[in-house]
């Protein structure tokens, strides 16, 4: 593994941890030359899964798009990057468990919303506004009302 600071090839692993899903290994590394420390992640890569978009197009599944959407929804909240990464891992695991080679973007959005609802209500409403394509303020109020009723 190359050091991101000096480009040296020689690094050592200081710590390794498997996440709760058992699908990701987090490694803390140190460069033997410059002593810089950095984190790497190893994830299981599953076969090609395609996402069916609303307009019918098919795109190769890309976990970074899920993370990007979650990060936008969680902006200026107390949700940590670690919590966001865990949610992405959970969504990916749920997709893998189906064994399907295709999944609709709507199904992915539903999985993300379920996870965000447990993590942060503000992020949930933000994500819902994009996922459900809100056009009116009443749509926001309806989602907030649903959240309040669930408590």
From Swiss-Prot:
It comes from the Bacteria. One of its GO terms (biological process) is negative regulation of DNA-templated transcription. Its cofactor is Zn(2+). Binds 1 zinc ion. A zinc finger (unnamed) spans 3-34. PROSITE patterns: ATP_CONE. Residues 49-139 form the ATP-cone domain. This is Transcriptional repressor NrdR.
């Amino acid at each position: 593994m190359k050091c991101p600071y000096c480009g040296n090839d020689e690094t050592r692993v200081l710590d390794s941890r498997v996440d709760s899903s058992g699908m990701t290994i987090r490694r803390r590394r140190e460069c033997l030359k410059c002593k810089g420390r950095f984190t790497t992640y190893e994830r299981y890569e599953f076969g090609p899964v395609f996402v069916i978009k609303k307009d019918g197009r098919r795109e190769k599944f890309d976990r970074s798009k899920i993370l990007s959407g979650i990060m936008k929804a969680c902006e200026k909240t107390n949700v940590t990057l670690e919590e966001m990464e865990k949610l992405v891992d959970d969504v990916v695991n749920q997709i893998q468990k189906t064994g399907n080679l295709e999944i609709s973007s709507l199904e992915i959005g539903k999985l993300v919303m379920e996870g965000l609802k447990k993590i942060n209500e503000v992020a949930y409403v933000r994500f819902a506004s994009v996922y459900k394509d809100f056009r009116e303020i009443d749509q926001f109020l309806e989602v907030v009302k649903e959240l309040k009723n669930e408590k």
